[in-house]
């Protein structure tokens, strides 16, 4: 398959804030073959896209989410995290069937595709169903079966993870990858994390874990183990020689920032979820300054309440400007890097995703520049980060395949997904 995108603005996110005003990009099979300015190459193409009044950029990478929690969107709001989890979310999650998880994930995929996300990093359960949804839809995903180290499910989570990695690692042409998902240091005792580390080494699988999301967690870990969460995990050896993505990292001291940098731990910043749950403000400018690959995530739709990475970019930039009282903090290009290149680096995929460069996987989005809120256009990067809306995402290409064109999803029936999701939600709450 050869696809030519011509007469289009291009933001490659290649380490500088430069962009191509009018150019072309050629896709061959699943890879970017070439891109540049001026006249496009001649030849035979399976598909040609005229990019007049549009911009091409890497697909967004949602570095931390719980996709099927779209089914819980709006079910419980305006509550503290632990009350929200223990009294509302966990009891309803206990009712979810594998089929529910499938349709909840498909609903999330509709929302993500239509807002420009091409890869998501997911932690949940019934992950066979999540993988099945990813395979069908054409999305790319890094998946982890959530593992809680206390209670009757702890052993099953180990066995499920082993089986899932054996079954799904590298499937769907490499669009599906799996890692281990120990939930958090407060739900996974040291002995359990030791087993997770052993399995990680045995299967050569990365780790996705929540870390230091709330002040209560931070203080409880300090009281229980005499160390802060990041220091506690370092003392156990969790970061040593493993590809680790730590979600949230809201409450950190300078020593912990140094530890994360030392071990090249990726961090998923979830600004809107952290704001909504009043968890705190992560020290993102300091982490970026230290060289940590800070990516962006939405968390689950039940605590956000959407999966829109354009909103996360805008929110992250604005949040840290006001928190530092410095309008120059986290400028537009840096926010875009967090949503693309840093997302790839944080997941150990920095050499194949997150940029538009020859040899990289052909994961990209085309955005419309014609609407009133995108006019005038003095600064293209600023318009994308500060003005764009999900509805501006016109087309999506993942692994060299057109997944959405002119706002129409090509790989599955969007209306069927919406109908099934509504039916599932009614069943869950008995309405």
Swiss-Prot record:
Alphabetized GO MF terms: 5'-methylthioadenosine deaminase activity; metal ion binding; S-adenosylhomocysteine deaminase activity
Record SUPFAM superfamilies: Composite domain of metallo-dependent hydrolases, Metallo-dependent hydrolases
Enzyme class: hydrolase
Signal sequence region: none
Pfam families, alphabetized: Amidohydro_1
Catalytic activity as recorded in UniProt: S-adenosyl-L-homocysteine + H2O + H(+) = S-inosyl-L-homocysteine + NH4(+); S-methyl-5'-thioadenosine + H2O + H(+) = S-methyl-5'-thioinosine + NH4(+)
Sorted UniProt keywords: Hydrolase, Metal-binding, Zinc
Gene3D superfamilies, per the entry: Metal-dependent hydrolases (3.20.20.140), Urease, subunit C, domain 1 (2.30.40.10)
Top-level taxon of the source organism: Bacteria
Binding-site residues for Zn(2+), renumbered to this chain: 64, 66, 210, 299
EC number of this enzyme: 3.5.4.28, 3.5.4.31
Similarity field: Belongs to the metallo-dependent hydrolases superfamily. MTA/SAH deaminase family.
Function: Catalyzes the deamination of 5-methylthioadenosine and S-adenosyl-L-homocysteine into 5-methylthioinosine and S-inosyl-L-homocysteine, respectively. Is also able to deaminate adenosine.
Name this protein carries in UniProt: 5-methylthioadenosine/S-adenosylhomocysteine deaminase
Organism in which the protein naturally occurs: Syntrophomonas wolfei subsp. wolfei (strain DSM 2245B / Goettingen)
């Amino acid at each position: 398959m050869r696809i030519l995108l011509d007469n289009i603005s291009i933001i490659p996110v290649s380490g500088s804030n430069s962009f191509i005003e009018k150019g072309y990009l050629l896709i061959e099979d699943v890879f970017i073959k070439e891109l540049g300015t001026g006249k496009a190459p001649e030849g035979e193409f399976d598909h040609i896209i005229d990019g007049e009044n549009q911009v091409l950029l890497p697909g967004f990478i949602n570095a931390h989410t719980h996709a099927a929690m779209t089914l819980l969107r709006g079910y419980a709001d305006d509550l503290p995290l632990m009350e929200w989890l223990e009294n509302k979310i966990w009891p309803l999650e206990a009712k979810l069937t594998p089929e529910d998880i499938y349709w909840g994930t498909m609903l999330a995929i509709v929302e993500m595709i239509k807002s420009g996300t091409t890869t998501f990093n997911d932690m949940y359960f019934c992950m066979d169903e999540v993988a099945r949804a990813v395979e069908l839809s054409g999305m790319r995903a890094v998946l982890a079966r959530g593992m809680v180290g206390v209670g009757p499910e702890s052993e099953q989570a180990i066995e499920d993870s082993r089986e899932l990695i054996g079954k799904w690692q590298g499937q769907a042409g490499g669009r599906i990858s799996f890692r281990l998902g120990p939930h958090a240091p407060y739900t996974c005792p040291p002995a359990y994390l030791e087993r997770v580390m052993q399995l990680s080494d045995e299967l050569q699988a990365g780790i996705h874990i929540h870390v230091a999301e709330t002040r209560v967690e931070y203080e409880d870990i300090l009281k229980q183990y005499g160390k802060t969460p990041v220091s506690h995990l370092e003392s156990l050896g969790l970061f040593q020689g493993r590809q680790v993505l730590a979600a949230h990292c809201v409450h950190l001291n300078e020593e912990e920032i140094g530890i994360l940098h030392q071990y090249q731990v990726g961090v998923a910043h979830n600004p809107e979820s952290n704001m909504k749950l009043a968890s705190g403000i992560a020290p993102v400018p300091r982490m970026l300054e230290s060289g940590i690959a800070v990516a962006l995530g939405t968390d689950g739709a039940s605590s956000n309440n959407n999966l829109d990475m354009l909103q996360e970019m805008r929110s992250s930039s604005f949040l840290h400007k006001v928190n530092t009282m410095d309008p120059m903090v986290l400028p537009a290009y840096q926010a875009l890097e967090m949503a693309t290149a840093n997302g790839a680096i944080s997941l150990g995929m920095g050499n194949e995703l997150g940029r538009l460069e020859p040899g990289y996987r052909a994961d990209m989005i085309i955005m419309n520049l014609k609407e009133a809120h995108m006019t005038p256009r003095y600064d293209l990067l600023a318009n994308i980060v500060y003005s764009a809306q999900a509805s501006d995402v016109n087309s999506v290409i993942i692994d060299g395949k057109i997944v959405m064109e002119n706002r129409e999803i090509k790989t599955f029936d969007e209306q069927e997904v919406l109908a099934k999701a509504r039916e599932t939600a009614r069943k869950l709450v008995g309405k």
